[in-house]
């Protein structure tokens, strides 16, 4: 797969809704929906609070599928050594070591930023701490392989083509609670396993919880932000070259 295709997440091996790469739905069976307010309350009764969703939120149902991490790169020649060096650089936050693993034209953003020197500068700046933290979160999320191109995390290379990446997140774990309200003590609507969820309007990335809608069967609720990852979050692309594996891109967005 060409680097441009990998950056866009549009490779030929996308997972499709028919379950060609997954066999089980993403959520543990639970109640079919969050409690609904009474249709015709008595005049003297206090109306039940309206949930933060509107009908338009559910217009496009996500496929019922799970995207747990897989390592499809492990068997590639030279990958084990490359990944070990990558993991060590991330664990020690060694900007020079990461730059040494990078291609001469490593892509850093969609505005023309590139090169090992620029990568080293980004990682060494005060704002680099957030990049290092995100790279550490990527490492356990698997690796996809397509020809001579590797993609971390794995799920980025296996997204259904029908998914809107700007409005969808991945639940990063098994048994993650989908709650009726944005509270650690709120009742559980369901438990989710590496599921894709749609964001409801009013998303606030600084909040502790996000209002989401699951794939079929559709359920509405709240998931803790620390258990969600944007489909457009940072990823690492590596390419096999004559000099071994090299980081081709460290990039976020689309």
Predicted regions and their residues:
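Sec-dependent bacterial lipoprotein signal peptides
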Residues: 1-8
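Bacterial signal peptide processing site
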Residues: 10-14
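Post-signal peptide N-terminal segment of mature Sec-exported envelope proteins
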Residues: 17-59
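Short, low-complexity N-terminal intrinsically disordered segments enriched in polar/charged residues
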Residues: 48-88, 100
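Short, well-ordered alpha-helical segments enriched in acidic and aromatic residues
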Residues: 94-105
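Short, charge-rich amphipathic alpha-helical segments embedded
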Residues: 106-121
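Boundary regions of SH3-family modules and the immediately adjacent low-complexity/disordered segments
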Residues: 128-170, 213-254
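SH3/SH3-like beta-barrel superfamily modules
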Residues: 188-227
